[in-house]
């Protein structure tokens, strides 16, 4: 029911012929930028793709037979980076969230944490204000279980939520990959199923649903009281980034 309700209140998303996957890492921790080229609904390999970081060309890559292409990337400075992939007349963008070693992240399962916003303008407003407040002290990582990055991103932007990455939820493996990149996971907010899957990875787990594997909260104000604490961010300098 929830995915249908979400789709009914936002603009439908077309199927792009190029896909850029959002990622999260830390300064000086290498990752592989991942793109996918498609022909209609199916993967289409063997295409040249130009990869740009904030409109600066990093490198040209060739996608494999499965349509996927990769580029090793190491960020020398923190921030939310824009990655654009262009192949012929097709293009798409994604984001890479880069954290300093002392920065902490809060994960938000969008379908689980924001489901009541479909029915209540008041809850939608309180959700937006709470996440914006949390983003002043923590980095926000959004999860999408069913709808995908495109639909979720349009909805978040429409509701003026803080900009950040949107990761596809793949169970505990998603959290393991984040920790492998040295990302400090401070808390997770979402459905009872998601926080149950996170019980071995994240200590602070909150849900608006009944759960035995975390704390059930009544509203976003309660979450703010439990999570809001000062976090000093180091002064950011200008760094150059590199792709290999």
Each language-model region and where it sits:
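Bacterial N-terminal signal peptides
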Residues: 2-9
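Solvent-exposed, well-ordered amphipathic alpha-helical segments
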Residues: 11, 43-47, 53-55, 84, ...
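Beta-strand-enriched, solvent-exposed domains that form extended recognition/catalytic surfaces
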Residues: 13-103
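Generic structural hydrophobic/aromatic packing signal, biased to beta-strands
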Residues: 35, 51, 85, 96, ...
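Fold-independent oxyanion-binding glycine-rich loops
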Residues: 51, 110, 191-192
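Short alpha-helical interface patches
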Residues: 56, 81-86, 112, 223, ...
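Conserved, compact domain cores that house catalytic/ligand-binding motifs in diverse enzymes
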Residues: 102-183
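C-terminal cap/substrate-recognition subdomain and adjoining C-terminal extension
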Residues: 147-244
